[in-house]
């Protein structure tokens, strides 16, 4: 079947830069979906997205749908006609459904059947609807109208190119009549651009100073920014989201180096970087030591004959913003950081839980407790907790919310606070996302865990639990943050004790009955998802959860040991044996004796198992106490043979009550050894 290239380009006013890439991808996906639904095959497809246009090129698109046959089965013959051979309502209804007379229905089989040959339509007849549907389905939160038209789109449309082969597809979409005329660069080539063919689309626009390919513009910007940064003996900060946004702002990218006064470098560089990136869309430069250079790179949308004028203009624009940051920094430093707590006493953390200052006091006490438990400095952790929210009341954070914690760090250093106390003011918010950086100091870790536990206990205490996708206080993230810090930093904290301490801090503001258990359950449930992501089966998590370790680090060490144990050849048999033992002991009447009496043994397998258990107990107890769970389970794996022999040779529920009770006691000893690590019966 013959095929031609197809091109559609919708010209608009400037599209939202943060949405341009996703709009282009969605446009392509919609076209591909429509072609597939229509049964039109093609060789390849690609999207073009620039500030004033969205386009899709489809290579070697079939010119015609294939013919197809449609067979519809109706009611059985017996139900289709009465005794006199007249069609019943069922038969007549089937004919109406098929859009034909009953005489055209095939009655030769067991059921009525209608066979229809459907000739394929020309692709050119289908393309307008496919394009229109794709545009209608674009992820546009809020569409707009313009002029007196009723059409709606993300921005007013200006032109439409639609070519199938060399011919224009005759249609009108979004108030634009299709043609072959596009537009060039707004300044370099502000004229009509005739698209000679779909295949020449990109080159025709390139000659008019428009790089329609988003990926090409992105690569040019990235490469040129790196080259310019290297020429300045620096490295550019190029966040992917910023690179995408800048790419979406320009049709003909020309990166240029600009500078600012070195006096601004006295301001925390994070504030300068924030305002230059977020407000001005500049790429900042760092030296080899990670310090901000007094230079930045802007990306112009024009190849100017006088680039110095563009540079000068950008330098003038950025100066007031840097001056503002400098002013806020100097104003904040006029008083001690701790003094800002007075303002926080009037700022509500949560209506039922008190002020932000109340929270800081709770975090201070809890951070001191945690630091003491994990080997940190209690006094410095408590100090960091007290200062932890102070910068929220500063001018700097008021203007740059993303500076919370960072501003506190600089102000604490300015006040002469210890380095780890200052760092903790920023590290309290770590990790800021999945896989993000963790606190580098024990003081920071203590404050970070304390802050999250305080929030969990408080919000749970007033009954505002997360439901479904709603989690306004980010409690799931807080719980995962606690777990990551304690496990990945190797901090052995009894979480039950820490949560109890946190509950006590609220002193009547929350419903404390069962609160600690509820919070612990929520936190440890988050571990389940963590392990699933790591490829560890739920049964392994459940085996450890059954013995209820309250230290996340201890919990993780047990999980890793059970995961390794599962790979041993003895694991399956021992898990099954433990399950059998668990079932037997659950049915024991009158409890199970604590001591095993060897004189009640009447089978060699009992003596052998008892001796093996005693030997394993001596080896395993010190290993379990030292949390060498891998080694402990490896030792216990040696019990497989005596356990198998015991169950093969002995009837546990002997008729003699004393013998039966003694065998229960022996099995209880066996099960107790494994429960020192995990309940491996769950694995069976």
Swiss-Prot record:
Q: Which Enzyme Commission number(s) are listed? A: 6.1.1.14
Q: Where in the cell is it found?
A: Cytoplasm
What does the entry give for GO biological process? arginyl-tRNA aminoacylation; glycyl-tRNA aminoacylation
* Predominant subcellular localization, coarse grouping: cytoplasm
Q: How does it associate, per the subunit comment?
A: Tetramer of two alpha and two beta subunits.
On the tree of life, the source organism's domain of life is Bacteria
Any one Gene Ontology molecular-function term assigned to this protein's record: ATP binding
Recorded name of the encoding gene: glyS
Family of the protein in this entry = Belongs to the class-II aminoacyl-tRNA synthetase family.
SUPFAM superfamilies, alphabetized: HD-domain/PDEase-like (SSF109604)
Instruction: Print the keywords alphabetically.
Output: Aminoacyl-tRNA synthetase, ATP-binding, Cytoplasm, Ligase, Nucleotide-binding, Protein biosynthesis
Task: List, alphabetically, the PROSITE patterns matched.
Answer: AA_TRNA_LIGASE_II_GLYAB
Reaction catalysed by this chain?
tRNA(Gly) + glycine + ATP = glycyl-tRNA(Gly) + AMP + diphosphate
Q: What is this protein called?
A: Glycine--tRNA ligase beta subunit
Q: Which GO terms describe its cellular component?
A: cytosol
């Amino acid at each position: 079947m013959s095929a031609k290239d197809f091109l559609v380009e919708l010209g608009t006013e400037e599209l939202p830069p943060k949405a341009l890439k996703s709009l282009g991808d969605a446009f392509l996906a919609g076209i591909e979906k429509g072609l597939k639904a229509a049964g039109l095959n093609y060789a390849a497809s690609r999207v073009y997205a620039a500030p004033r246009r969205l386009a899709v090129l489809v290579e070697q698109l079939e010119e015609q749908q294939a013919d197809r046959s449609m067979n519809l089965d109706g009611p059985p013959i017996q139900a289709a006609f009465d005794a006199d051979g007249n069609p019943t309502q069922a038969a007549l209804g089937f004919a109406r459904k098929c859009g034909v007379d009953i005489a055209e229905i095939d009655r030769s089989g067991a059921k009525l059947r209608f066979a229809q040959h459907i000739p394929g339509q020309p692709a050119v007849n289908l393309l307008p609807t496919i394009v229109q549907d794709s545009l209608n389905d674009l992820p546009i939160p809020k569409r707009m109208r313009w002029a007196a038209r009723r059409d709606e789109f993300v921005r007013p449309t200006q032109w439409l190119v639609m070519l199938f082969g060399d011919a224009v597809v005759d249609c009108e979409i979004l108030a634009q009549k299709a043609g072959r005329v596009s537009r060039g660069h707004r300044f370099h080539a502000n004229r009509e651009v005739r698209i000679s063919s779909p295949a020449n689309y990109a080159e025709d626009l390139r000659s008019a100073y428009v790089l329609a390919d988003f990926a090409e513009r992105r690569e040019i910007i990235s490469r040129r920014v790196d080259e310019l940064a290297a020429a300045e003996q620096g490295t550019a900060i190029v966040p992917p989201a910023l690179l995408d946004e800048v790419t979406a702002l320009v049709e003909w990218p020309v990166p240029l180096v600009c500078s600012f006064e070195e006096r601004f470098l006295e301001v925390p560089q994070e504030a300068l970087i924030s305002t230059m990136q977020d407000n001005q869309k500049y790429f900042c430069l760092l030296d080899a030591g990670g310090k901000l250079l007094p230079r930045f790179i802007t990306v112009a949308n024009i190849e100017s004959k006088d680039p110095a004028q563009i540079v000068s203009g950008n330098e003038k624009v950025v100066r007031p913003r840097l001056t503002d940051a400098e002013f806020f920094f100097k104003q904040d430093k006029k008083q001690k950081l701790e003094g800002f707590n007075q303002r926080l006493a009037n700022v509500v953390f949560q209506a039922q839980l008190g002020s932000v200052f109340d929270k800081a006091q709770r975090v201070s006490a809890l951070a001191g407790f945690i630091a003491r438990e994990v080997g940190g400095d209690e006094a410095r952790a408590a100090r960091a907790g007290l200062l932890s929210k102070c910068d929220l009341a500063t001018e700097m954070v008021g203007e740059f919310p993303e500076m919370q914690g960072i501003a506190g760090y600089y102000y604490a250093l300015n006040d002469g606070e210890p380095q780890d106390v200052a760092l903790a003011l920023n590290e309290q918010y770590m990790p800021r996302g999945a896989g993000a950086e963790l606190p580098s100091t024990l003081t920071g870790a203590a404050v970070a865990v304390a802050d999250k536990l305080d929030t969990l206990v408080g919000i749970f205490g007033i009954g505002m639990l997360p439901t479904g996708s709603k989690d306004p206080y980010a409690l799931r993230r807080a719980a995962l943050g606690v777990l990551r810090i304690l496990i990945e930093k190797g901090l052995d904290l009894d979480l039950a004790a820490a949560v109890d301490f946190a509950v006590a801090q609220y002193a009547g503001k929350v419903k404390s009955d069962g609160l600690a258990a509820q919070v612990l359950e929520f936190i440890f449930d988050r571990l389940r998802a963590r392990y699933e992501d790591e490829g560890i089966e739920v049964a392994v998590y459940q085996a450890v959860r059954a013995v209820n370790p309250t230290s996340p680090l201890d919990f993780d060490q047990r999980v890793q040991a059970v995961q390794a144990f599962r790979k041993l050849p003895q694991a399956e048999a021992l898990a099954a044996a433990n399950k059998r033992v668990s079932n037997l002991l659950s049915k024991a009447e009158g409890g199970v004796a604590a001591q095993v009496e060897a004189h009640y043994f009447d089978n060699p397998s009992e003596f052998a198992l008892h001796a093996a258990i005693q030997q394993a107990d001596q080896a395993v107890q010190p290993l379990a106490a030292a949390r060498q769970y891998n080694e402990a389970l490896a030792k216990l794996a040696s019990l497989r043979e005596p356990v198998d022999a015991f169950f093969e040779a002995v009837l546990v529920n002997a008729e003699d009550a004393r013998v039966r009770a003694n065998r229960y006691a022996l099995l209880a000893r066996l099960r107790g050894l494994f429960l020192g690590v995990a309940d491996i019966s769950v694995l069976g």
